[in-house]
C-alpha cells in the first residue's frame, strides 16, 4: 500500500467474501477475504490516508458474470429470508467498521452483476418453471444491501458494478431495469480488461 500511496493513488478497493473455507475448514485461497481479513486491510488503508471502496461479493469466493454462487451458509434461504440475511450481513460488517472508526467511503453492492447476484434467487432471468430470480429477485437483494448502507454509513457512496465495461447494450439493459425499479445508487462501476473486452 505504501507504493500506491507514494504514487498518488487515492482509493483502495477491498473485497469481502462471506465464509472463506471449505466444509472441512480449509481456506479457499484467493486472499481469504473473510470479515477479519477485510477489516485488517481496511484498517491498513485508512491509517495510510486512503479512501476505501468496500466490495461485497455476497459469495464465499469470486463472484463474476459466470458465477454468483450463494454463500454455503445461506443455501436454504429464499425470498424475504435471504434478503434479510444479506441485509444483516452487510449491516454487521458496516457496524464493526463504524465502531473502529474506519467506515468505507464507498460501498459496492455485489461484484460484476451482469446477470444478477446470489444465484439462483437474484439471477436476472428465470429458467423454465423456476419461480425465483428475475429482476424482482435481483432488485430485492440490491435494496437489502443498500438499506444497510443507508442506515449505518449514510454518507458512503453506493456503487452498482458490472463487468464488460465496453458493452453499451449490457449497461443499458441492466441499468434501465434497476433505475425503473427505483434502486437508489450513486455510481456505476465497471470492469474493463482489454484482453477480454476489446477496446472502446
Where are these regions (language model features)?
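Substrate-binding cleft and catalytic face of glycoside hydrolase catalytic domains
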Residues: 3-134, 138-157, 163
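Aromatic- and acid-rich polysaccharide-binding/catalytic face
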Residues: 105, 111, 156, 160-164, ...
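Conserved N-terminal glycine/acidic-rich loop preference
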Residues: 142, 168-171
Amino acid at each position: 500500500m505504501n507504493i500506491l500511496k507514494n504514487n498518488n493513488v487515492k482509493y483502495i478497493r477491498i473485497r469481502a467474501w462471506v465464509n472463506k473455507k471449505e466444509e472441512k475448514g480449509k481456506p479457499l485461497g484467493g486472499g481469504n477475504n473473510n470479515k477479519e481479513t477485510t477489516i485488517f486491510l481496511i484498517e491498513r488503508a485508512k491509517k495510510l490516508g486512503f479512501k476505501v471502496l468496500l466490495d461485497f461479493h455476497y459469495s464465499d469466493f469470486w463472484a463474476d458474470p459466470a458465477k454468483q454462487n450463494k454463500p454455503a451458509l445461506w443455501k436454504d434461504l429464499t425470498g424475504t429470508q435471504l434478503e434479510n440475511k444479506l441485509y444483516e450481513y452487510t449491516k454487521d460488517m458496516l457496524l464493526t467498521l463504524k465502531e473502529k472508526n474506519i467506515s468505507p467511503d464507498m460501498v459496492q453492492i455485489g461484484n460484476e452483476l451482469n446477470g444478477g447476484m446470489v444465484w439462483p434467487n437474484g439471477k436476472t432471468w428465470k429458467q423454465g418453471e423456476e419461480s425465483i430470480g428475475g429482476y424482482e429477485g435481483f432488485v430485492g437483494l440490491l435494496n437489502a444491501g443498500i438499506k444497510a448502507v443507508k442506515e449505518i454509513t449514510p454518507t458512503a457512496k453506493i456503487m452498482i458494478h458490472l463487468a464488460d465495461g465496453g458493452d453499451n447494450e449490457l449497461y443499458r439493459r441492466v441499468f434501465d431495469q434497476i433505475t425503473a425499479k427505483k434502486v437508489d445508487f450513486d455510481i456505476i462501476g465497471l470492469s474493463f480488461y482489454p484482453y477480454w473486452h476489446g477496446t472502446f
